[in-house]
Amino acid sequence: MESDIIKISHLNKSFSEVKAVNDLSFRVKKGELFAFLGVNGAGKSTTISILCGLLKKDSGTVQVNGIETDKAGAQTKRMLGVVFQDSVLDKPLTVKENLKSRAALYGITGNAFDKRLQELVEILDFDEFLNRPVGKLSGGQRRRIDIARALLHRPEILILDEPTTGLDPQTRQLIWNVIEKLQKTENMTVFLTTHYMEEAANAGYVVILDKGSIAAEGTPFELKNDYVQDIVFVYGISEDEIKSLNREYKKIRDGYQIKVRNTKEATKLIVEHQDLFTDYEVVKGGMDDVFLAVTGKKLGGER
């Protein structure tokens, strides 16, 4: 049975009159990809800052690998590698200089640093610009170094705050290939915030925040079943035939779409009208639809 590597219980944090985190409780299993979703201001960054020891909580408990962060902050911090949304690299320094100075804080120097650097160069493919100043790197190159910096000390948990925002598709895919490899080879836990719902759809568990509280949680499959309808697309039939089903429908290119509560209802409809459903597909709603149904907002923050 998988153990909980992060456990947050009844966490609260306010800024003056604003309740940023409101009685928040959730768990993250060791080795899983955990997605933490919410619009800007929902409480994600505050929670992450408390988890990383950068911000004091008002009340509640935060445990990393069974250890309370209040009681052994230095020990729990070493278990975490963090990639912040805004890069914390020193732009005038080269990539190697940035990583060397960071590694020294963990006591990784000399041959140990050289060995770890070479491992990260191979994993993240940055040998070509190892000696280039960070200020001269592209956004995608800089993001790779942000991740390398977070991985220097072999953390058990990698926290990724919007890791692929603004990156080209090729770099996004490279980063996710690395993350998936680390999960498989090192059983690394990944704590993700993202605006890309296709990334959240691959998570083992999802928590959706709204105004500092959990609005919904579960696996992507559970959330899609609970909050959004399936859609049946049917092709090659006339409008009179679609009307004969006595259901609401929408005209689309080359056919029609019908919303159903779930796959069971879709199957029943198709079996009962096999003569009409000779060319069709059943599609579950996506995580974008889940987020909109739960919060009334798009992840970009629009109502």
What are these regions (language model features)?
Residues 60-68, 75-76:
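Conserved ABC transporter NBD signature motif
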Residues 100, 104, 111-129:
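Conserved ABC ATPase "signature" region
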Residues 133-137:
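Conserved ABC ATPase signature
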Residues 154:
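Conserved catalytic motifs of ABC-family nucleotide-binding domains
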Residues 158-161:
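Catalytic Walker B motif of ABC-type/P-loop ATPase nucleotide-binding domains
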Residues 177-261:
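ABC transporter nucleotide-binding domain
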Residues 228-299, 303:
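Short, charged/small-residue-rich alpha-helical element at the C-terminal edge
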